[in-house]
Amino acid sequence: AKNIDVPFSDRYSISIINSEKFLKLPKYKALNLIKSFYNDTYAVDQNACSSPHLILWKGKLNSKAKKKFWLYLNNLVKYIYNPPLITSVDNYSRLVKDMIKNNNIHSYKRLNRSLYVVTLKKLHPNFFLKKTKWGFFYECNIQNLKNINYVTNRSLQTFTYFGFSKKFIKYFFKVNNFNGIDR
């Protein structure tokens, strides 16, 4: 029998969260959102094209929302995610390389060996070169949704969102004619 290789494009995905809407969620709904996020990322070790690597935060309460989001995710990850031990080395190595080579890093958090969050100062067109796995995420605050244009290109596969209406998102992307984004 012959093997047939099926090539997959090297794609990435991003998510945007409206911080005010996230903070208004009752705890059980916030936990459901976190579980959905977990399923999109950790269940496939962030290897799926639809797994977000960059989380964008929009709103005036970003710091408070981020703290709650990552805390809830960390609590879930600690109890149900069991990656290989190499995860610790890979994530730490990635962080060190980023700290040395990337002057766009504002700060970072290591919540556990499988949850690293690197906060970017601003969005950058070459972000798509930073595909991650095993619970290593980049995040960035954005003031204007049009800034998403900095990270849209043909490699962008999926754009997930919370706290914005589907109608608004469809209109926004149609009007701004961003590159990439299959779904």
Model-identified regions with their sequence ranges:
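NAD(P)-dependent aldehyde/semialdehyde dehydrogenase
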Residues: 35, 42-160, 167-183
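Conserved NAD(P)+-binding/catalytic subdomain of aldehyde/semialdehyde dehydrogenases
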Residues: 1-61
